[in-house]
A protein has these predicted regions:
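Helix-loop elements that line ligand-binding/catalytic pockets
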Residues: 152-236
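Short, small-residue-biased leader/transition segments that mark boundaries at the very start
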Residues: 1-7
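Conserved beta-strand -> loop -> alpha-helix junction used to position metal-binding or nucleic-acid-contacting
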Residues: 89, 99-142, 268
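RNase H-like nuclease fold core
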Residues: 11-85, 90-100
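Acidic, glycine-enriched active-site microenvironments
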Residues: 61, 84, 213, 223, ...
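Hydrophobic "anchor" residues on beta-strands that sit immediately upstream
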Residues: 27, 85, 106-109, 264
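Basic, amphipathic alpha-helical segments enriched in Lys/Arg and hydrophobic/aromatic residues
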Residues: 229-313
Length: 313
């Protein structure tokens, strides 16, 4: 009976927040997710639970620091002070939440968010070249048409036109060179020969990835990042200079990764589980408490989170 009352009490405010103080641990993650219709939620989870029972510490509608802080402050202070490390992305709201609610915790920026910024910058450069290639191809076609000549695009060494080369190179730029297929290797050679700036940008992205991949200590990583900053500065690439400035702003929190090598990969994986759970119950509008009791165990927290009525719309 007491357990049912507890569940009923949680469901009464589930539209806005759910908190599970008993699930707090020394190493936690905070991340945002959009399980339905693009509506954002902030999820705080316990890394040691590994996605099983006791994983979710809190789920709050929205990402506003004040709203999330208000919900997390419902957890007793002595429990919040037990948290030793919190992993997160580089958003100011996440940093503020962590500082307010878990003052004893070391704040660690997720390495994968950093690497994604570099990949996005590289892809931005590729896309810019592709638009230029499309424009050049269109102009050449129009010129040939005006002259009454047949248009034949330039074909590169691997059989691609410039447009095709830039379109088909998207996925290989995400991968390390040692993981390229033979055709990707050939395409990369042509790409880098034709667009040297993409080769340099790819090298910057790869070197940043390698800094985080090496099992090194914090001081050594500090030196490696300083060298990377110098390379970025020498390149003159605007998008990479923006990344370098962002990393510099979060310098200590970025370097904290090398203490325990903690990431938000677990949180991202668990968020995917929540989305899958939401999709499996698409169309359900009214689930009775008796049915809720059947979901005890591994996914009880997921179920309670997904009782937020906007997720069921």
């Amino acid at each position: 009976m007491g357990s049912e009352m507890c569940i009923r009490d949680r469901l009464s405010h589930a539209e806005d927040w759910l908190v599970f103080p008993e699930n707090i641990g020394e190493s936690i993650c905070i991340d945002e997710t959009a399980p339905s219709n693009g509506e954002l939620y902030t999820i705080v989870s316990n890394r040691s639970s590994r996605g099983g029972k006791g994983t979710i510490i809190a789920i709050v509608k929205g990402v506003a620091a004040d709203a999330v802080t208000e919900a997390l402050m419902r957890i007793d202070e002595d429990k919040r002070l037990l948290v030793k490390e919190i992993t997160m992305d580089m958003s100011n709201s996440m940093r503020l939440i962590a500082r307010r609610c878990f003052p004893n915790a070391m704040r660690t920026i997720d390495r994968f968010h950093i690497q994604k910024l570099a990949c996005d910058a590289l892809q931005e450069m590729r896309i810019a070249h592709r638009w230029d290639a499309i424009q050049a191809d269109t102009d050449a076609r129009e010129e040939a048409k005006c002259l009454g000549e047949a248009y034949t695009p330039i074909v590169l060494a691997n059989g691609d036109t410039h447009k095709q080369l830039l379109a088909r190179s998207r996925y290989l730029l995400f991968k390390s060179a040692d993981k390229w297929t033979e055709s990707q290797r050939q395409r990369a050679e042509v790409l880098f020969e034709t667009y040297p700036d993409l080769k340099e940008a790819y090298s910057l992205t790869h070197s940043l990835r390698m800094i985080f991949s090496k099992n090194t200590v914090k001081d050594a990583a500090r030196l490696s990042l300083a060298r990377w900053y110098n390379k970025v500065d020498d390149s003159g690439f605007k998008s990479f200079n923006v990344i370098a400035a962002t990393l510099y702003e979060h310098y200590d929190e970025v370097l904290n990764f090398f203490v325990n090598r903690a990431t938000n990969a677990f949180a991202e994986s668990f968020n995917a589980k929540i989305k899958a759970f939401r999709a499996a119950l698409r169309g359900v509008t009214d689930i009775k408490l008796g049915q809720c009791k059947k979901l005890r165990g591994k996914f009880i927290n997921c179920y309670l989170c997904l009782q937020i009525h906007s997720l069921w719309s």
